[in-house]
Amino acid sequence: MVIKPSVNTTLSGLSANGSVILRHPRWADFDYWVALRKENQTYLQPWEPEWNAKHLTRLSYRSRLGRFKKMVSGGDAYPFHIFRASDDRLIGACNITHIERGVAQSSKLGYWIGEHYARQGFARASVTAACKFCFESLGLHRVEAAVQSDNLASIKVLEHVGFQQEGTARDYLKINGKWQDHVVYAKLSGD
């Protein structure tokens, strides 16, 4: 059964080091989000589009929350912040985007975890929870994720969760100021 989740949707997953909670970004997360982004700017830079200090302003965050609300209410995307369940600490984000209905029934998935929380199973738990949500709640058939070939930690996450490599997309995304090839992975509802 396909449901239309609300902006208050919360997901949970288990990692080797406890559990994670995925919930939609909200205004109360702003200070924690800014601190996490600042703390991890250098760590995440090789894997993300360029961004500057304006990205971390209250105005920018408020605007982002407005866009998120529209995307969720339209069923186009479901952005989530990732929290460590043991202490409700914001540790990353996991976004379900580019939802296509009709004959495609698919979406794209992106995620990041702060360096201090990496390699502890939190990304794996988050991706697992997001896929379950895509297949069981949204009724999607396919979830796609694209990763740079040298992002071995992310590749390991995808493969462990059951994504299969499909090929390479040339100059797929402009990351860190440069067009980058990405390896495309996908997981199907029947996998």
Residue ranges and their predicted role:
Residues 70-75, 163:
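Short loop/turn motifs at secondary-structure junctions and domain boundaries
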Residues 1-32, 36-46, 79-191:
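Acyl-donor (CoA/ACP) binding surface of acyl/acetyltransferases
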Residues 45-66:
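Conserved GNAT-fold acetyl-CoA-binding loop/helix
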